[in-house]
Amino acid sequence: MKALVKREASKGIWLEQVPVPTPGPNEVLIKLEKTAICGTDLHIYLWDEWSQRTITPGLTIGHEFVGRVAELGSAVTGYQVGQRVSAEGHIVCGHCRNCRGGRPHLCPNTVGIGVNVNGAFAEYMVMPASNLWPIPDQIPSELAAFFDPYGNAAHCALEFDVIGEDVLITGAGPIGIIAAGICKHIGARNVVVTDVNDFRLKLAADLGATRVVNVSKTSLKDVMADLHMEGFDVGLEMSGNPRAFNDMLDCMYHGGKIAMLGIMPRGAGCDWDKIIFKGLTVQGIYGRKMYETWYKMTQLVLSGFPLQKVLTHQLSIDEFQKGFDLMEEGKAGKVVLSWN
């Protein structure tokens, strides 16, 4: 079967022929229909410092997908061949304190598909049946293909109460853009998004952001003054940029709450005085709550949340290089690849 493989320890990704996997007793074989390129996939493509210490060459990458059940393991019940599914890309152990305590998203033994084990950029893949998420008929496959990052955005946006609150989002990648839309959809007062990429800031505005700020041209403090704000009640850090995070700390209202998804460089510092003397709460976010986040993000789309506005490109798998080029240049929202 075709698969996108990180063949070499250098920049690039390669379309290769690999064996079709065989599902174990509690697994399901999935025939992929559509997959989406994530920022993590771009890191692996670029072979940056994180990838070099994390990825073993020879890996089939990818973790954002939708497909149909092609074969059931001998012990699997509750699913049918031909059923359309996505899946939680974090495979957890099931026996640690957090898994047994109902907090599997905090499992210290988590294995990520497309990072630690072979992933979804292939014609077929296997997943534990317990990780599957059925996709309702009303949701098109091109949107279901990126439920994984949509779930990251939903986890962040729903971590704290944002109804009637002023929200600052640093980083207008697809996850930040979607999070901005969710915050407005559920009743935030002002949602301000910062970045230096005007293309992606426009997508955030299209999804409902009150103001988008190119911080290379405009002062965030000036925008706050225009909105008659003393500070932000909730911050969502999506950029992984230490300067953006410190700007957020500077602009938070006393007692504010911050959800952090962006991965900071090793050794990055911050102004601890702002966190301490403002009484800020900082919560790390990893993945999605299993499976409450999946339920809520599904219902958001079914209730009219315009997730389609962040989808900018649909390509065939043979055009994968164009997709990675668009992501590298910052000229895309979500890029979806078709395997049909």
Curated annotation (Swiss-Prot):
The free-text note explaining how the cofactor binds reads: Binds 2 Zn(2+) ions per subunit.
Chief localization: cytoplasm
Q: List ligand-binding residues for Zn(2+) 2.
A: C93, C96, C99, C107
Tell me where the transmembrane regions lie: none
Database matches in PROSITE patterns: ADH_ZINC
Gene3D superfamilies membership: Medium-chain alcohol dehydrogenases, catalytic domain, NAD(P)-binding Rossmann-like Domain
A Pfam family this protein belongs to?
ADH_zinc_N
The record's GO CC annotations read: cytoplasm
Function statement: Catalyzes the NAD(+)-dependent oxidation of L-threonine to 2-amino-3-ketobutyrate.
PANTHER family according to UniProt: L-THREONINE 3-DEHYDROGENASE
Identify the NCBIfam families for this entry.
Answer: PRK05396.1 (NF003808), tdh (TIGR00692)
Query: What is annotated about its quaternary structure and interactions?
Result: Homotetramer.
Q: What is this protein called?
A: L-threonine 3-dehydrogenase
Please tell me the species this chain comes from: Xanthomonas campestris pv. campestris (strain ATCC 33913 / DSM 3586 / NCPPB 528 / LMG 568 / P 25)
Which taxonomic lineage does the organism of this UniProt entry have? Bacteria, Pseudomonadati, Pseudomonadota, Gammaproteobacteria, Lysobacterales
Please name the gene that encodes this protein.
tdh
